[in-house]
Amino acid sequence: MRRSVYLDNTIEFLRGRVYLGAYDYTPEDTDELVFFTVEDAIFYNSFHLDFGPMNIGHLYRFAVIFHEILNDPENANKAVVFYSSASTRQRANAACMLCCYMILVQAWTPHQVLQPLAQVDPPFMPFRDAGYSNADFEITIQDVVYGVWRAKEKGLIDLHSFNLESYEKYEHVEFGDFNVLTPDFIAFASPQEDHPKGYLATKSSHLNQPFKSVLNFFANNNVQLVVRLNSHLYNKKHFEDIGIQHLDLIFEDGTCPDLSIVKNFVGAAETIIKRGGKIAVHCKAGLGRTGCLIGAHLIYTYGFTANECIGFLRFIRPGMVVGPQQHWLYLHQNDFREWKYTTRISLKPSEAIGGLYPLISLEEYRLQKKKLKDDKRVAQNNIEGELRDLTMTPPSNGHGALSARNSSQPSTANNGSNSFKSSAVPQTSPGQPRKGQNGSNTIEDINNNRNPTSHANRKVVIESNNSDDESMQDTNGTSNHYPKVSRKKNDISSASSSRMEDNEPSATNINNAADDTILRQLLPKNRRVTSGRRTTSAAGGIRKISGSIKK
């Protein structure tokens, strides 16, 4: 087990192995200690009075140097002291960089890396913004550490896939001055066109090198939306020509956006993210206004605090979120987090944001959802109505022989015949197959009843074969009007006990024939159509017979 090393102005991170120091002199290595610093190799490029924190590229370079020292066989049993000068700014940068290293590389938790820094005297200096006004808002090492840790937990930072060469190349102005903040967002300074004639160029061949670099990178990295927050310094057609949608959400430099702009931005960004694309956002410098909107989305999506969000953004792109925008983000951080649960992405696109979908309240979302359901129901009903109109059958022309009677008794017409009327068959039947005597099959024509035949020319054959079913065939086969027959009770009784002779139909058989034709029409074709009374067959089943009881 390694033993502790006690040195003045030194903080122990890992017992006997990793220490943080601050000295006004250059310490010399011993048999037990190895000292190193990066102040002469890694520099923070300040905008004004800002001095840190160091960015992710600085951390990557620091990690490479640190690992070389730790893995040197000569240092296997020595404690390694990472130190800085005694300057308050340098102490803060060194401590913050070592803490972020332990979070990202060694997978320490925030409380593990912050515990050694607690109660340090003098305390570490907080970081300020890149603006020119007095620093009235500060973030601490703790804010940066928690911001980096949360980004790591949410999959926004991965040093294993980090490309140092690309990062350092594109952060330079001559290559576009942009940084990939997260897998979904790119922050960049506004491209500018050289237009000495007073108009914006429309051909990309006349663009300067930074603009061309931006266009090439965006086209090759699935950027689907560019959001402009400043006044026009280029023609948006350059982005649209390569298939990138362009959106203007302009507000004044150095000011804070209205919440309606934020909702439009968050909704538009969510729309693009769900499509699998990236969003590139810029203002004049790509720092203040850009940081406001991207920061609001990070808080909305991942639950950052305002300070954590600012710390993380500056860790990726130094200088982001300036002046009063820091206070604005702090004051509205709870609003942005609540939006995750109190708002929804609109179901209707907004022309104000180029046909994308803004963020709306739950109440408005419910109304939209209800209206869409109602509209869908109405449209479905209209379609069904149109289909019914197309497939509706014409009304009956009254000539069908198989139409049902208005009553159980035949009505007496002026011509003295019995007329049967029904709407059971909506259109004229083409004729039904019938079984005839001696196994012969015929087609009964039941359509032509315009010229009814006389009673003398009609012949109704009712036959009882060996089967239990009876068949009836109209040998003349056309008219559904029968002559009026006077009948008595005894006649009906006699007709029910004997077969009909001389082809003279009785009223009972006429009624049975009409019932039989109606049953034949209404019953499914695969059923056996029978008529007459019910009786028990030899097998014990019930059968209908025509006119008489089968013995």
From Swiss-Prot:
Places the protein is found: Nucleus, Nucleolus; Cytoplasm; Bud neck
**One Gene Ontology cellular component annotation held by this UniProt entry:** spindle pole body
**SUPFAM superfamilies in UniProt:** (Phosphotyrosine protein) phosphatases II (SSF52799)
- Which GO terms of type biological process are on file? autophagy of mitochondrion; cell division; cellular response to osmotic stress; chromosome segregation; meiotic nuclear division; meiotic spindle disassembly; microtubule cytoskeleton organization; mitotic cell cycle
Which GO terms fall under molecular function for this chain's record? phosphoprotein phosphatase activity; protein serine/threonine phosphatase activity; protein tyrosine phosphatase activity
Chain positions with Phosphoserine modification: S467
**Residue segments, region Disordered:** 384-551
Name the Enzyme Commission number(s) assigned to this protein.
3.1.3.48
Q: What is a single Pfam family found in this protein's UniProt entry?
A: DSPn
Q: Which domain of life is it from?
A: Eukaryota
**Residues forming the catalytic site:** C283 (phosphocysteine intermediate)
Instruction: Give the compositionally biased regions (Polar residues).
Output: 404-455, 505-514
The similarity annotation says: Belongs to the protein-tyrosine phosphatase family. Non-receptor class CDC14 subfamily.
Q: What is this protein called?
A: Tyrosine-protein phosphatase CDC14
